[in-house]
Amino acid sequence: GYDIANYRAIDPTFGQMEDFQALLKKAHDLDIKVMIDLVPCHTSDQHPWFQESRSSRDNPKRDYYVWRDGKNNSEPNNWRSLSGGSSWEFDERTGQFYLHSFLKTQPDLNWDNPEVRAEMKNIVRFWFDMGVDGMRVDAIWGISKDPDLKDDSPNPDFYGNPNDYGAFIHDHCKMGPHFQEYLQELASVCDEYDDKQMVFEFYPDDKLGDIYHQYSRILTAHPKASAFFMEYRDNEWHAKNIEKKIENYLQSANSTTPFFCIGNHDQPRVASRLGIERARALSFLNLLTPGISVVYYGDEIGMMNGELTANDIQDNFSPANSVVDSRDLERTPMQWNDSQFAGFSSVKPWLPVNDNHTKINVDSEKITNDSLLNMHRKLLKLRQTFPILKNGNLSIVQNTDNGFILGLKRELAGQRAYIFINFADAPQNFSTPENAKIITSTHSVDLITAENLQMIIPGYCGVLLIV
């Protein structure tokens, strides 16, 4: 899990440090970069820091975590854990509460303590010096909180259990007054190296304003630091909606390397939440935007949420082993082939293999010309063939004559590339640039009609043109 007991070691469950170093060397021999997760906002309650911190109120590590007295015979404030219930846990040994934004076994670090910030920067240096190429910084929003521990405001749009995380607007428990300062301090470690990258995990929160604009100053100062574009998780399927969010993100990211992704380990599979054809269109878009295109394992073959029972659930973040709320649905084993355990393992894996692995798997998609996997391969090859698809600037094509069509333009050294995506389920007609040549599409090019600067493309279809 994400309860770190030692920031400088490999959990023995997964091997030894020598195993990781061998993996790192092999990856570098193959010209593959390796990024690892950094979880900077909390540790395990088994971490030596916390064991010392909870031992007494005057321990030197006490201020490494957030400890407070109760208020009116209750918790210090109304903050809620992401897993539900109070964010505070009473510790009888010292008679105070400690803060945990996640599970009670994951106490929050106190980033207002400069010693904690120095420790975290040294941890980053430890892995960078070993040869790790970058860090994905998890749940970064928790590094700064309201110093006065003000109560969070009630969420007027929430009608569920008042103990749920969503019952409040999280206007004081995260992204506090030192958020930008601490982000900048952590990102500054990248400046000490020539070839390291840091990417932050942010989830947009409309109730807290524009997150991307809030960190844009930091990332401009540290172009080796960036943040994921997570807006594709929004199920509002509309061309103008996506257009606005892409434009907003690129303006905020400025000189940094964009990280676009359509799915991850915390969200339902894109093929499950949007359908396979929409997932195909988004994958096409994702691989043709600037910067780094992040593909969550299995999305390249259209993997769907697993079909699990309550007894299958391993994720203790899910309330009462709720299947509906479980993140395990999107974490089932990779489907390599149609064998019993999908080629992932020779024994029963941690989570059950999806029954549809007999049809949706890598081996079958390799030999299917128009498969989602082969579309990914084709686009990745095109990114290597055409520098414009890797390094070209991106702008919005404002006049596609059609509200269902998302139009993007890439430009580099006098060359132009156009990406058009049909967000409707029916064929759409729109104007095309003069002298544009069709390079590829989500589906067979034979399905696309182009004549007299007009093009008709099928529903949920994308097309790449180059002038």
Over which residues does each language-model region extend?
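Beta-strand-rich binding/interaction modules
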Residues: 426-445
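Loop/helix patches that line or flank the sugar-binding groove of alpha-linked glycan CAZymes
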Residues: 152-172, 181-183, 187-193, 197, ...
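C-terminal beta-strand-rich structural cap/linker in extracellular carbohydrate-active enzymes
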Residues: 449-467
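Hydrophobic residues within beta-strands of alpha/beta enzymes
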Residues: 135-137, 228
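Glycoside hydrolase catalytic-domain groove-lining segments
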Residues: 237-255
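Acidic/aromatic-lined carbohydrate-recognition and catalytic surfaces
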Residues: 1-125, 129, 141-206, 334, ...
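Short catalytic/ligand-binding loop motif for oxyanion handling, primarily in non-cytosolic enzymes
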Residues: 1, 42-49, 143-146, 206-210, ...
